[in-house]
Curated annotation (Swiss-Prot):
Gene Ontology MF annotations: CCR4-NOT complex binding; small GTPase binding
Alphabetic keyword roster: Cytoplasm, Phosphoprotein
Identification of the protein by name: Granule associated Rac and RHOG effector protein 1
Region annotated Disordered, chain positions: 681-771, 855-992, 1032-1070
Taxonomic classification: Eukaryota, Metazoa, Chordata, Craniata, Vertebrata
Composition bias, Pro residues: 692-702, 977-992
Function in brief: Acts as an effector of RAC1. Associates with CCR4-NOT complex which is one of the major cellular mRNA deadenylases and is linked to various cellular processes including bulk mRNA degradation, miRNA-mediated repression, translational repression during translational initiation and general transcription regulation. May also play a role in miRNA silencing machinery.
Any one biological process term the GO annotation gives: Rac protein signal transduction
Subunit relationships: Interacts with AGO2 and TNRC6A.
């Protein structure tokens, strides 16, 4: 149209431009093939405005070459027309080409890339068409502003200044069009191109590119939405990261200060910094409480935009961790390494993790086959022949921890973390199976759901710089997380990308570290209201009616301060969890524990409590009964050791049969018994009853664990359930949190557990869960020999001797009798009623009295010596001690009330784990050697090893003895002092006296107490209420106090409900 002159055309510029009116259009078409292509491509496209003008404009584009007489204006008009046409032709050509490719790649791994590119090209083409059709009238209007005759000017000198300005506006308009088109096209095409390269070229993705993995995509709209969700999450909880008046986060300020100063920080400045951190922590807690029951959701895929997630995490965690988050690499084949160890629900089939007598390959094969069958049910294989294993691998990779753990942790950090002050850690899960991932089929979609629970803790780096004691069990809050990945088989078949996994987060409302009775969710610890709560609860409780009982307990009982059970609650929680590992959701357990039920994790109990409430009620009642029964027994007098038992003690002390002790190392026995208990809910049930009586002490610790354990213990539980091997590393990883993991409870771990009420209770439980596996699995095992020696080999030896005397051989090299002996002594009356009576214990009342007196005297002496000895017992367990050295141990036992409550909790645990395991600890060993305690210890060990819950509670008497009795005994009685067990006075009332060991007779306990004290540091007793719970961590002394709490506990033995899972830590237990 611009080939002809203005006169020739007799048309104004506007009409000519719009019509593309060139008289020589036809000739030009022949000269330029491009317009032909343009017309061909535009036909199907038919954007009316664009097609005609564009085609004609393109044709005219070449016209000035053909025409001998051309002018600058005509050339410019023609050039603009050709340019706009070219944009449309280019877009149509590229769309047409990608469409051709995509039809060829239908079932290959290139199809996804071709389809993505085609979609983007169509979008760009439509945008270009709208842009060019809108710009042409604008250009025409501008050209009409040229001066008269400008179209015929041939020399630039002829153009007026106004003409130059008009042409300048045309130029800028064209530049703008050019820029907008290229920018828009790049924005749309670049991410798809990167995705294509990632899917098709990168070797790891070559074979899975067409499958549209659940997580592989570039900066597509899906990723952009994910980035928005990350930013939104961090902003939603920004009040948790309030900066000081200096604009800096308190924790970061402290860390930077210490890094920048080479000289020691002066005392006064250290004090100021501590005050600042206290203030920041208080503000954080208040802000956390103000968040309410909000549920949060965000997309995963943090590795797809490292810079965005790093920016979003500012203030939520350290800079180094933020950088690592986006660069976190998933192992190329996590399935082969991790899947065998992961219990998983596939459809209606629940497949456990690999067991010690099964090969990982067989386990993997079974899970893969089951997954394949589920997909075949969906008919996903119709027409699919190549790579039909891809969806199986893709889905199963989603349940591997390396795939979801990092994402879940990052999500929790985004919401609840504060750099330098609050860190996110895995909650200890003892019942790994309750948290098993679930893969289900919903139409053509395969849905993978992975529940997990995380805990918010004070940043240990900052706290250690400020020389603050840190309680590993203290948590600021618990967070439930549900990771959901969906693989749409139709999308996969079509080669389209899958949606990114979704992460749903909800803050648990039970924050018990301050001793507050935070309202824990009833049921599984999942919020009862809200979709996430229901889903999470459903997932985590599906394996366990037992588990439910735990949660119910949490809801029923929250008076941590008021009830021993509460104190126990912290310790008990973990213990119970440990015991329930097989059946109960860790969180549920913690909650139950919190609820103050000595949810002795014995599977049977959980099984019994199909309804949380019932379970709780059962636990509570049971505990009371046990306690009462025990008390009754105490009143009557404990069953005294028989001559045979005494002979055993003598043999033990004389070194006779020392070899056996090793064989029957308490660790192993307990482990097995625990495992057995876990495995057989029935056993657990039986144990539970025992536990309840013993639980009197255990309950307290259970609750404690509940409060804190849910966080830390859960991981422990999970490891337990997973497998001994897994358990070991996990235990080590969370050792400071759940040192008392059940399996670890064996001597080495037991000591550590002793510190942690949690741990100890957990340990028994873990032992149960993991106890199935060989001792070697236990993290504590490494220190087993030292533990045995530390314990003086006494504990294990005594266990062996006892088992032999009782006719119960140690279960195995590592099957110490302790763990197994369901020491019902702690259970006292209840155990007596439930379990066969041990003739050896009660046959000679006079002898029993003598032993009791000796035991009491010894304990009193110990109390005097170690009353508050913070770390002695711990000292015996190097792992524990070191782990918790930070805390002031003595403090733990200074609080009489808390102590005694804690003791209950801790004791139960410690009794079961710490005492047994490391009863050899100084006092324990000492008391053991000293006479009645020793006899009692032997006897109890025996019982434990036998796994029967004897009613006799000789060793326990000290625990049960009320402080008064103990004091009285100490003051007025010597050898014959009243057997502690004989004293019915409830320890709880007397226990409070801080000076008196919680259990006069339980000097071993007091040792443990000391340990606990060490643990008690403020951290331990996140709450004063929980201080007892903190004690429970100590677990050695816990036994005695618990009995006081429940009265039944007077015996000081925790019933080892889980067949030794929770062996009462009767004071002398070693």
């Amino acid at each position: 149209m611009y080939c002809c002159s203005a006169q020739d055309s007799k048309m104004d510029y506007k009409r000519r431009f719009l019509l593309g009116g060139s008289k020589q259009k036809v000739q030009q078409h022949q000269q330029y093939p491009m317009p032909e292509l343009g017309r061909a491509l535009s036909a199907p496209l038919a954007s009316t405005a664009t097609t005609a003008p564009l085609g004609s404009l393109t044709a005219a584009g070449s016209c000035h070459h053909a025409m001998p007489h051309t002018t600058p204006i005509a050339d410019i008009q023609q050039g603009i027309s050709k340019y706009l046409d070219a944009l449309n032709v280019f877009c149509r050509a590229s769309t047409f080409l990608t469409d051709l490719f995509s039809t060829v790649f239908r079932n290959s791994h290139y199809s996804k890339a071709a389809t993505q590119l085609k979609d983007v090209q169509e979008h760009v083409m439509e945008a270009a068409s709208r842009l060019t059709s809108a710009i042409k009238p604008e250009i025409a209007k501008m050209l009409m502003e040229l001066s008269a005759g400008a179209a015929n000017f041939t020399d630039q000198k002829e153009f007026s200044l106004q003409d130059i300005e008009v042409l300048g506006r045309c130029f800028l308009t064209v530049v703008q069009v050019h820029f907008q088109f290229l920018t828009h096209a790049l924005q749309k095409v670049q991410p798809v191109a990167h995705s294509c390269f990632a899917e098709v070229i990168v070797p790891e993705k070559k074979n899975s590119g067409s499958g549209g993995g659940l997580s592989g995509m570039g900066h597509t709209p899906e990723v952009e939405e994910a980035v928005r969700s990350w930013r939104g999450a961090a902003e939603a909880t920004s009040r948790l990261r309030e900066r000081g008046c200096d604009g800096c986060l308190a924790g970061i300020e402290v860390q930077q200060l210490f890094c920048s100063q080479s000289a020691a920080i002066p005392e006064h400045q250290l004090k100021e910094l501590n005050i600042k951190i206290d203030s920041a922590l208080q503000a954080y807690k208040i802000a956390l409480e103000s968040l309410g029951h909000c549920e949060y959701a965000m997309k995963a895929g943090f590795h797809l935009n490292p810079k965005a997630i790093e920016a979003s995490l500012q203030g939520c965690c350290s800079e180094a961790e933020a950088q690592q988050t986006g660069r976190r690499q998933t192992p190329p084949q996590p399935m082969q390494c991790e899947l065998p160890t992961v219990p998983v629900q596939i459809g209606s089939h629940f497949l456990k993790g690999v067991s010690f007598n099964e090969s990982a390959a067989d386990n993997l094969k079974l899970k893969t086959h089951t997954m394949l069958q589920l997909m075949k049910e969906a008919g996903c294989y119709n027409g699919i022949t190549s790579r039909d294993d891809f969806p199986v691998t893709e889905v199963l990779n989603q349940v591997c921890p390396s795939t979801w753990r990092g994402a879940c942790k990052t999500a929790v950090q985004l919401l609840f973390g504060q750099a330098g002050l609050v860190v996110v850690d895995t909650a200890q899960i003892e019942n790994k199976e309750a948290y098993a991932p679930q893969i289900s089929l919903e139409g053509s979609r395969i849905v993978v759901q992975v529940p997990s629970t995380w805990c918010l803790k004070e940043d240990p780096a900052t706290m250690s710089l400020l020389q603050r004691s840190l309680d590993p069990e203290k948590t600021l809050g618990l967070v439930d997380v549900l990771y959901t990945a969906v693989l749409d088989l139709n999308r996969w078949r079509a080669g389209r990308e899958q949606a990114l996994p979704c992460i749903q987060i909800q803050l648990q409302r039970e924050i018990c570290d301050f001793g507050n009775q935070a309202d824990l969710p009833s049921g599984n610890g999942n919020k009862s209201s809200g979709g996430l709560q229901k889903t999470f609860s459903k997932l985590t409780s599906r394996f366990t009616k037992k588990a439910s009982c735990t949660s119910s307990s949490s809801s029923t009982n929250y008076s941590i301060q008021n009830t021993p059970s509460k104190n126990i609650f912290i310790a008990g929680c973990s213990e119970e969890k440990a015991k329930m590992p097989g059946n109960i959701d860790t969180r549920l357990q913690s909650i139950l524990n919190i609820g103050n039920f000595p949810r002795t994790t014995d599977p049977s109990q959980s099984a019994q409590n199909s309804s949380n409430t019932v379970a709780n009620g059962f636990l509570m009642e049971r505990r009371e009964n046990f306690l009462h029964g025990d008390d009754g027994k105490d009143e009557k007098g404990m069953n005294l050791p028989t001559d045979q038992e005494m002979q055993e003690v003598i043999d033990f002390l004389s070194g006779f049969n020392m070899g056996q002790s090793h064989q029957g190392s308490p660790l192993v026995t307990r482990h097995n018994s625990a495992a057995t208990a876990m495995v057989t809910e029935q056993k657990a049930g039986a144990m539970q009853p025992q536990q309840p009586s013993l639980p009197v002490p255990p309950p307290p610790r259970a609750p404690q664990a509940g409060a804190h354990t849910p966080l830390t213990p859960q991981p422990g539980l999970a490891p337990q359930q997973q497998s001994p091997k897994q358990q070991q590393p996990q235990v080590q990883y969370y050792q400071h949190l759940l040192q008392p993991i059940g399996p670890q409870q064996p001597p080495p771990q037991p000591r550590a557990p002793g510190k942690w009420v949690h741990g100890s209770s957990q340990q028994p439980a873990q032992a149960v869960g993991a106890g199935l596996s060989p001792l070697g699995q236990w993290p504590g095992i490494s220190d087993l020999s030292s533990d045995l020696y530390s314990l003086g080999l006494v504990s294990s030896y005594m266990d062996n001797v006892m088992s032999e005397v009782l006719g119960q051989k140690p279960q195995g090299p590592r099957n110490n009798t302790w763990p197994n002996r369901d020491q019902s002594d702690g259970v006292f009356g209840m155990l007596g009623e439930i379990l066969p009576f041990d003739p050896a214990v009660g046959s000679d009342p006079e002898f029993a009295r003598y032993v009791a007196g000796v035991s009491q005297a010894m304990q009193q002496k110990r109390q005097a010596q170690h009353g508050r000895r913070p770390g002695n017992p711990r000292g015996n367990w190097p792992p524990m001690d070191d782990a918790h050295r930070t805390w002031p141990f003595p403090e733990f036992f200074t609080e009489g009330d808390g102590l005694h409550g804690g003791w209950s909790g801790a004791q139960g645990d410690s009794a079961s784990s710490s005492d047994e395991t490391s009863s050899a600890n100084g006092d324990s060993l000492f008391s053991m050697f000293s006479g009645p305690d020793l006899v009692a210890a032997v006897k109890q060990r025996r019982k434990h090893s036998s796994g029967e819950q004897d009613t006799s509670t000789l060793p326990s008497p000290p625990l049960l003895t009320t402080v008064e009795d103990v004091n009285q005994d100490n003051k007025t009685k010597t050898w014959p002092p009243k057997a502690p067990w004989q004293h019915p006075s409830p320890l709880p009332s007397t226990l409070p006296s801080p000076s008196a060991p919680l259990y006069a007779v339980t000097s071993p306990g007091s040792q443990w107490n000391d340990t606990m004290q060490m643990l008690q540091s403020p951290v331990w007793a996140a709450t004063n209420d929980c201080s007892a719970a903190a004690f429970s961590y100590v677990q050695t002394p816990p036994q005695p106090p618990p009995p006081p709490a429940h009265k039944a506990a007077p015996k000081g033995f925790k019933a080892f409900p889980g067949k030794g899972e929770r062996r009462p830590a009767y004071l002398p237990q070693y």
